[in-house]
Amino acid sequence: MSIVNLSSYQFATIEDTAAWRPFVTERCNALGLKGTVLLAPEGINLFVAGTRENTDAFIHYIRHDALFEGKFADLQFKESLSDKQPFTRMLVKLKREIITMKKPAIRPELGRAPFVDAPTLKSWLDRGHDDEGRPVVMLDTRNAFEVDVGTFDNALDYRITKFSEFPEVIEQNRADLEGKTIVSFCTGGIRCEKAAIHMKDVGIENVYQLEGGILKYFEEVGGAHYHGDCFVFDYRTALNPQLEPSKTTQCFGCRAVVTPEAQQSPLYVAGKTCPECHPDSKAARAA
């Protein structure tokens, strides 16, 4: 596998994202990278891929170039490998938030949420409680279709369709969280960081985020206490606990996630339809 896939984010105050955009675009193109870099007043969120030499050069650029004023000097990257480029083009986008929650009072760049690392979380889940004896509840902050690909055992899943719904569902389900240690998690850490800050802001105690998200957990401890794969937003569709592309795919017709089991259905036609969008399925639901 010759392509290195990098993902990272960091909350940091950026005064003028528009001034950064042409410089970041130029450097990414010069390095032959493809993917997406999001710039917002609250920070950076990126998914890029390229050769080892060029991704290493990109990491050095982000950490050390004077443009960034040292804001990302300690930026940590999650890495996986693939045999082909997962992205079709290079985009640097300006956004209001690097992950949309529509809660402007939440400012992660002013202070991180408490976090738990993967080995500690595994230890808690092995025992069924944290170091103080409180039961541990895993809270999935991802969208429902992502959760369906895989999640932690017995995780709370409120079936949200977009992250901006998270504050409302938490208010509706506070009773699920009282008296427990809550560990919010997501793919790479960005959503669960905002989620943890929001929960603390509304008075929910003993809240943590999973440091580095599911992918970092896979990297450090494998798939313990996790079932299924982890959905990712590129051609690989999902990664297994060994951080290898799984057999899960997306329907060419409707972009629904199609598990290996669903691919056995006669309604799944590669490159055309799946059980969600096949005409026979639609007719049955309408009946």
Swiss-Prot record:
Sorted UniProt keywords: Oxidoreductase, tRNA processing
Enzyme class: oxidoreductase
Any one GO MF annotation of this record: oxidoreductase activity, acting on paired donors, with incorporation or reduction of molecular oxygen
Enzyme active site: C186
EC identifiers of the protein: 1.14.-.-
Similarity comment: family membership: Belongs to the TrhO family.
Name of the protein this chain belongs to: tRNA uridine(34) hydroxylase
Source organism per UniProt: Paraburkholderia xenovorans (strain LB400)
